Amino acid sequence: MMDSSSKSLTQYIPSPMGSLSRLKQKGVDNFQKVKKSGKSIYNYNYSKFVPHPFSTIDESVKHSESGRYDDLEIIRPTKEKEVTSSVYKRNSGKSLNTESQFSLGDSDAATLVNSVATFKLNNASTSTSLVSSSSTVCSQAKSSLRSPTSRLNDTKIKEENNYISSVKDYCGPMRKSMVKTEILIEEPLNPTTDIKSFINSYNHGKAYSLGETQHLHYYQLPFPWRENRYIIHGYRFYNTHSKSLLSIFNWYGWHNETSNIWSHLLGAIYIIYLAIYDFPQSEVWRNSQVPPQARWIVFMFLAAALKCMLSSVFWHTFNGTSFLKLRSKFACVDYSGITILITASILTTEFVTMYSCYWAMYTYMSISLALGVFGVFMNWSPRFDRPEARPLRIRFFILLATMGVLSFLHLIFLTDLHYAATLFSPVTYKSVVWYLVGVVFYGSFIPERFRSDVQVDKTIPTNYELSTDLEIITKQREIHFREVPTAHSKCSSCPSHAKSFKSLWWVDYFGCSHTFWHFFVVLGVIGHYRAILDMFAKRWILS
């Protein structure tokens, strides 16, 4: 009877080996599910934005095309907080296609960011629950197998424990993986480079296509090409250097750099005339009382002035290129030319004022030369070329020019105020005054700031705002991403006002602040050359 009773009891007690086999298979299945889910999260990289024109994306498009962007990298929110406009996950090592466009919809661009983040957070939560269930299976199996009701012998229990350990080996890495995922989800987020890349490349494909056949207006340009918001029409966007060279002669029509190119090109030609013909005919050249070093100082200044003029011509000729990296380097050539001209001007004044005190002359000239070299290297910094760095450029050039004041003060100490003022006066009224007037035009955007044919933007977004501020592409979209310039309010009441002389429409092609700046720089260079000859004559011929 006992045998039959035991036999009937074993029918209801599951076999230890069969139970562990089923437990192992279930754990393996759960692990494969979690592993597959984890891989889908890890491989979700964001390589580029949606290549659509800048228009509204409705919800159907978002859902229908969600499968196209499986390479998106997760934008990890901090727990379940909303991803704000300044919080993104950096997508390192990726860049936008320069010709891609992206549409953000009418609601808010942050909605797109939050939707991706929510999708990933849900995936992570699902994976976490799978791991939790697997861990629960392990603990329940261990508890049931060690229950006294099983009444298994020690050998069986030992074998079952070995199987339990093997199941734990499957569960353990899953728990560690999800802990790592949770840490990644909760880590602080940095501004994404993709927002910056998108905004910087916005309109590039359209501008590249239009630039092959026509000149563009301000709002057809990508953001890095927008420097003077008061100049609206006549922008070049060429894809070859040969087109840029031919634009010197307006081969493809008059553009907004024509007057800037020719103002300094004519100035360069006149400087060559001064160096070849005028200076060799001067009294300073022929008089034996003037030291030979003085003649070389004059030639050094004229060479620096020629370098400045040609660098400016080079920049204004090629700044219409469609290649951003080349354009930035071309701008640095122009800044370097200005730095070299200012440095050479200071060296000429220090030479003539401190010639009787050699140690002071060499000291001042060495310091000025070192600052000039430092300035040339600083000019090649990407930050120096940004539109928001315009005040910095002005302050640096003025600071460099003030080095000449130190030699003037030292001359007063060595002689007297009357002699120093008499010797230095030609530089003041023949050169410095023209530079100062030019700086006023350069920094104030006069006269184009008073144009009334179109509505001008109040500001240009800074480089940091272009990288982090989503309001530029949401709330301010109608300002910075408009298709055509907005007519001024005066044009609505008087349609003919847009083409009248009073509206200042012509500043796009001639008479803008930069052209005036060029004109006064040429006057300052010629004036400084005349001032040097006067100072040399007072110092060595008339004294």
Curated annotation (Swiss-Prot):
Which GO terms are recorded in the biological process aspect for this UniProt protein? intracellular zinc ion homeostasis
The residue spans the entry assigns to the Cytoplasmic side of the membrane are as follows 281-295, 354-357, 417-425, 527-543
Q: Which GO terms describe its molecular function?
A: signaling receptor activity
UniProt keyword list: Endoplasmic reticulum, Glycoprotein, Membrane, Transmembrane, Transmembrane helix
Tell me which Pfam families the record gives. Answer: HlyIII
Outline which residue ranges sit on the Lumenal face.
1-259, 317-330, 379-395, 447-505
Membrane spanning residue stretches? 260-280, 296-316, 331-353, 358-378, 396-416, 426-446, 506-526
Identify the glycosylated residues. N45, N123, N153, N256, N319
Q: How does it sit in the membrane?
A: Multi-pass membrane protein
Top-level taxonomic group: Eukaryota
State the InterPro entries in the record: AdipoR/HlyIII-related
Gene Ontology cellular component annotations, sorted alphabetically: endoplasmic reticulum; endoplasmic reticulum membrane
Task: Establish whether keyword Transmembrane helix is in the entry.
Answer: yes
What's the main place this protein lives? endoplasmic reticulum
Which regions form coiled coils? none
Q: Where in the cell is it found?
A: Endoplasmic reticulum membrane
The similarity comment for this entry is: Belongs to the ADIPOR family.
> Sorted alphabetically, which PANTHER family does this protein's record hold?
ADIPOR-LIKE RECEPTOR IZH3-RELATED, ADIPOR/PROGESTIN RECEPTOR-RELATED
The task this protein performs is described as: ADIPOR-like receptor involved in zinc metabolism either by altering membrane sterol content or by directly altering cellular zinc levels.
Q: What is this protein called?
A: ADIPOR-like receptor IZH3
Q: What species is given as this protein's source? A: Saccharomyces cerevisiae (strain ATCC 204508 / S288c)
